[in-house]
Amino acid sequence: MMGRVNSQLLRVVQDRSVANGEKLQRLYKLISATGSKTATATTTATTTTTATATGGGRVLALDSHVHRWFNTHVRGSKFYSHYHFLIKHGVHLAHATRFFNKLLTGSEVEFQLATFQIFLINEENQQVFFEKFHRLYTFDMMLQIFDRLIARRDFRYVKFYLAALTRKMSELATDRTRTVQDAELMYIKFNNSLLYYLLMEGNVPMFLRTFKNEVEYIKSSTLQNSDSAEVQQALLKPVHLFVQMLRKNNSPDLIFELLPALQTKSRSKVFNAYLTSTVASTIRTFNDPTLMLKFLLTTAKGTKFPELLNELGLWRYIVHGEPGKIDPKSLQEDRDKFEKANSVSALKAMKRVDVVLLTELYRVFLSYSSSVMSPDKFRHCCIDLYSHYVQFCEQNKHKLRGWKFDTGVLNVILYHIRYRLRDDKLAYEVLVDFYGRESMVQSVKNTAKKCPFSMVIYDNGTVTTQQLHALLQLMQRYNVPLSFQICYTMVKRLLQMNEPEQAFEWYTRILESGFDVRHHGLVELVLQQGWSLPHHFNHDLLEDDKLDSIIEEEPTEECAELVEDVKELMQSV
């Protein structure tokens, strides 16, 4: 029957001899006649409008070309009446997304029509919702409506929407054309929306139970190796919602509710690593070194992590608030106390996570210490931790390649010396000392976008010209690539020394290296010297004052590096 109806509708659409207004009326007449043969009308009234809708009956699946014609020729002022007409006559709304999205963001009465709330307000007309909502909308459109209502904190009819979604899933489960992956994705999307509702409602216990169940389901599903962006987004959404829940409730200890789910055997190391790194990044926002230590010990691979932290001088600082190391007996006592207070067994994670999280521990501890210690005590703390770190690295330099030895910890220490302690000279001395240990440095990998040399050289007036050249020679010796910060500093320094030709050579390096010229200080110098900006430079930035300034920002590349690796892996599988 629908094949014949669609043929008639298409003939009307393609008839060039008929004006668009007349076409619209003919299309409506054909749809109305088709719908009236299989449906009965029910009338519902609101204070602003009258909505009439059919009850049961078949769904009319109009040809997509007919919907396209509607998209082009139905005026904005008629969107509401058009959409109401489609609902009234049982037209499937999958291809009416233009009207759907517009009404969702329109007036209150338009929103009520798109969400079918108009049929729920009056109990006498709720049957229309029960019979039509799940039949006229796709599953994803139903979820979109549900999420939009939750975002508005409109929980009045949650049970109706959840019942409709459950009914839709049950019907789709019997569709033999759908794959196992389709069913898994549908279930995960539904749970994501349910988590969002529990988050917004503030039901933490139910949120945690639902979250753990979903993570365990994901780990046993066949979707983890999918390269679909839609699938990846669905898989990672529960983690984002969990992070939102932690921050909303300001309850960092709840993060350990996640650990049992992390311990579940996963088909995908990528997904497991993403969970671990996301939790670590979240913990950092609470700026609590004890909390980070607790999490790091639960995610550590092997049993020697407390010993490592003791060798690095971190354990005594975090646990006892004092510098130095403690004896093995005291360390074991501390460890026993920790295990007794925290009954969480070790987690399995990617091998490199240990180093990434170690860098995070340094970052959190130094950030916290800079706010509670006096400047003199914090200075001693930075020097003490650096000394223990390089001593450990030199003693274990033959093992460092397997340990993924990089510049993460050094960057964190240098950052806090320069921008928290405000001691540029000490930062220079630490950098020179580190790269003066030749046998150790040969094992170092510069994995961060902002290398240690950039951290020290950028806008550092205490570094003399002679010292600057010595640092550049060190970079060349160890194949450390030039960064924008270093090139900009050289341009600025040489212009101050009245060496415009050499300064221009460094500016040329910036252009040849492909660095994006958006820095306010550099653009100002270029304009002052009459040099040419790159041909692709957006001159609107000058008028809108949208140029960048390289500010004092903590280097987060080491933790972000793992997340980027995860994304790349997920895209490549």
UniProtKB/Swiss-Prot annotation:
Intracellular or extracellular location(s): Mitochondrion inner membrane
Keyword Transmembrane: no
GO molecular function, one term: translation regulator activity
Keywords: Membrane, Mitochondrion, Mitochondrion inner membrane, Transit peptide, Translation regulation
Entry keyword Membrane: yes
Membrane topology designation: Peripheral membrane protein
Record InterPro entries: Atp22
Coiled coil: none
A GO term from the CC aspect: mitochondrial inner membrane
Lineage top rank: taxon: Eukaryota
Function recorded in the entry: Translation factor specific for subunit 6 of the mitochondrial ATPase. Required for assembly of the CF(0) component of the ATPase.
Family: Belongs to the ATP22 family.
Name by which UniProt lists this protein: Mitochondrial translation factor ATP22
